Amino acid sequence: ILLMSACAMIYAQAGSSPYQAIVAVDGSGDYKTVQEAINAVPDGQTKPWLILIKNGLYNEQVIIPKNKPYVHLIGQDKDKTIIHLNLNVGSKLTGKEIGGKTAYWEHSVHNPSSPVYKYEGSVVVVKGDHFYTENISYVNDWGVLSDNGPQALAMNSQADCASFYNCKFRSFQDTWMTANNDVSRHY
């Protein structure tokens, strides 16, 4: 992991880039969203595909599909490179409401009127094996702002050999979920 970061710095100093894609919300990179860069990764990679994510607030859901292994997301600064979204997996309450709490329904993936309707229930979903990330904050705004309510995942990693270095994960409940099987190793 440290070797990869050191190599990236050496390439940057030499004037050539080790990255296959650069994401910048301000438009100064190859892509403005992380998902656009993920979509451009060739299927069936057998070596790391490095994506630099410049500092910024990326308000989006990111899904790394199973057919895109070896995706590496590398941020500039974990406090300034933030992938976030406001969503939860709460279902509509019927009958007596629990403590008057129904505000979550507006941001539920089950609500047909919600902007996140039918989204997968996490800010980031990793299905591609050999995923690596560093220097990025993954934040589910629902959990951070509400501090109560239904499940609000920031990260759902279903892949094998996923590595996380110098990252932040923020939400309220069930912030990070991993696959429930014997072949999903995380580092």
Positions of PLM-derived features:
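Right-handed parallel beta-helix/beta-spiral solenoid domain characteristic of secreted/periplasmic
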Residues: 23-27, 50, 69-150
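Bacterial Sec-dependent N-terminal signal peptides
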Residues: 1-16, 93-107
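Short active-site-proximal "capping" loops at secondary-structure junctions
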Residues: 56-60, 78-80
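Feature marks extracellular polysaccharide-active and adherence modules
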Residues: 54, 65, 74-76, 127, ...
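Glycine-rich phosphate/ribose-binding loops and adjacent secondary-structure elements
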Residues: 38-41, 163, 169, 185-187
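Acidic Gly/Asp/Thr-rich repetitive segments characteristic of extracellular carbohydrate-active
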Residues: 19-52
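Glycine-rich beta-solenoid repeat tracts in large extracellular/virion proteins
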Residues: 62-65, 85, 122-127, 144-146, ...
